[in-house]
UniProtKB/Swiss-Prot annotation:
Higher taxonomy: Eukaryota, Metazoa, Chordata, Craniata, Vertebrata
Gene name as annotated: ldha
Active site annotation, chain numbering: 193
Key words, A-Z: Cytoplasm, NAD, Oxidoreductase
Residues reported to bind NAD(+): 29-57, 99, 138
UniProt GO molecular function: L-lactate dehydrogenase activity
Name of the molecule in the record: L-lactate dehydrogenase A chain
Top-level division of the source organism's lineage: Eukaryota
Length: 332
């Protein structure tokens, strides 16, 4: 008789029940692991699966997490380079992708990531045909479009992390400027996650008080308070962090967990995430950009109709045209 048999008496046979809230993270780089730990610390899944092509790194990361399982509510943390480990995931977060080389064109980086996605996406679909696909890899808007095309999923089940982080950065800087908590500062960054993102100055408010009514020049030239610099800090923020520490990780990881939470808990919260915007705000092409969207357990359920000013809408259309210029050159 083993120690286990001496210690434990079986009362009933345990029936195998699959995970109800399984989350997979593809790619165990800095962003992937920050996303994984953020998801675990918010108790969002009953099983976490990690996938990567680098077997030693993958094994090391999963062991490191498993060693801390006493401090977590999620006791089942698994990893493999074989995608069968991801089977029946509710949400699959894709953070894998090539890094931009010095002097490499954006288009070249995109095509390299498209080639990586051609392997990743069909494997996700094979093992989790009903999952919600969340793309985090950059350039996120174009790669969300690529994932949508390669997966064959309906548009509501393919979401890009988009400007959820840009908007969080915006609210943080706004809070610093006003000496308020970011959650009390309301403002939206929409459009492309990156250089051509669009700040919706007309909607910036605190407690329902529109800041543009108090300062009509807010966000424009000739504003003595230079609020335009807030958006510049949002755009430059990632570059600044990369310059200082080599990569971004924690904030994007927390942003991913924020989105996953809205999905698995069916919160119906509004987030600025990347979705198909053809036919909205004058956009004519099949592009993905961030607009305020409602997230719940079936994915992206609704899109909020923003009341944009003419110049804001013009910026959004320009952003869409820039992305389409890159997309139409891709070979899928």
């Amino acid at each position: 008789m083993s120690t286990k048999e001496k210690l434990i008496s079986h009362v009933s046979k345990e029936e195998a029940v699959g995970s109800r809230n399984k989350v997979t993270v593809v790619g165990v780089g800095m962003v992937g692991m920050a996303s994984a730990i953020s998801i675990l610390l918010k108790d969002l899944c009953d099983e976490l699966a990690l996938v990567d092509v680098m077997e030693d790194k993958l094994k090391g990361e999963v062991m490191d997490l498993q060693h801390g399982s006493l401090f977590l509510k999620t006791h089942k943390i698994v990893a493999d380079k074989d995608y069968s480990v991801t089977a029946n995931s509710r949400v699959v977060v894709v953070t894998a992708g090539a890094r931009q080389q010095e002097g490499e064109s954006r288009l070249n980086l995109v095509q390299r990531n498209v080639n990586i996605f051609k392997f990743i996406i069909p494997n996700i679909v094979k093992y989790s045909p009903n999952c919600i696909l969340m793309v985090v890899s950059n350039p996120v808007d174009i790669l969300t479009y690529v994932a949508w095309k390669l997966s064959g999923f309906p548009r509501h089940r393919v979401i890009g992390s988009g400007t959820n982080l840009d908007s969080a950065r915006f609210r943080h800087i706004m809070g610093e400027k006003l000496h308020l908590h970011p959650s009390s500062c309301h403002g939206w960054i929409v459009g492309e996650h990156g250089d051509s993102s669009v700040p919706v100055w007309s909607g910036v408010n605190v407690a329902g008080v529109s800041l543009q009514t108090l300062n009509p020049k807010m966000g424009a030239e000739g504003d003595s308070e230079n609020w335009k610099a807030v958006h510049k800090m949002v755009v430059d923020g990632a570059y600044e962090v990369i310059k200082l520490k080599g990569y971004t990780s924690w904030a994007i990881g927390m942003s991913v967990a924020d989105l996953v939470e809205s999905i698995v808990k069916n919160l119906h919260k509004v987030h600025p995430v990347s979705t198909l915007v053809k036919g909205m705000h004058g956009v004519k092409d099949e592009v993905f950009l961030s607009v305020p969207c409602v997230l719940g357990n079936s994915g992206l359920t609704d899109v909020i109709h923003m009341t944009l000013k003419a110049d804001e809408e013009k910026q959004l259309v320009k952003s869409a045209e820039t992305l389409w210029g890159v997309q139409k050159e891709l070979t899928l």
